[in-house]
Amino acid sequence: MIDENGFRLNVGIILTNYNQRVFFGKRINKNVWQFPQGGLKNNESHVNGMFRELKEEIGLTRDDVIIIGKTTKWLSYEIPKSYLKGTSNYKGQKQIWFLLKFIKEDIAIDLNTTTKPEFDQWTWIKYEDAIKKTAKFKSFVYKKAYSELSSFFY
């Protein structure tokens, strides 16, 4: 779903483990690392979209996590023109971010729950390192999400 300004409505997921590390996935067949995220469907709530993306991208369900917090407003970023294909009015992503606590064992994480997986590798990483490792155009949103949700981390 794309809004009137060309931004795709989206949810982002920050999944933390018991060591205060965050899940970070490498996009399949690319050297690009990011948090799980994905577009909302028409009339889909933020929470339902987040749980759908969590299942599709890393194989987790409601029983595997606890919602700790979420951003109160949309955070957005523009995708560089060199990444865009075609002539649509699409500009970037507009996201609500969720902070989740992972309460199961790592074995529960499954990157192959769909016929088109998003990630081919993953790791637990410090949040600050995730900001450094992601695409530059996304790092601002990662910083904003952390700023708003950081009180829940410690």
Show the residue positions of the predicted features.
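Acidic, metal-coordinating catalytic segment for phosphate/diphosphate chemistry
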Residues: 1-18, 87-88
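Active-site beta-strand termini and strand-to-loop segments that position acidic
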Residues: 15-18, 27, 100-102
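Charged phosphate-binding loop/patch that engages nucleotide di/tri-phosphates or the phosphate backbone
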Residues: 127-154
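A short gly/proline-enriched turn/hairpin at secondary-structure junctions
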Residues: 34-38
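A conserved beta-turn-beta hairpin within the catalytic core of GNAT-like acetyltransferases
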Residues: 29-31
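Unchanged
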Residues: 40-135
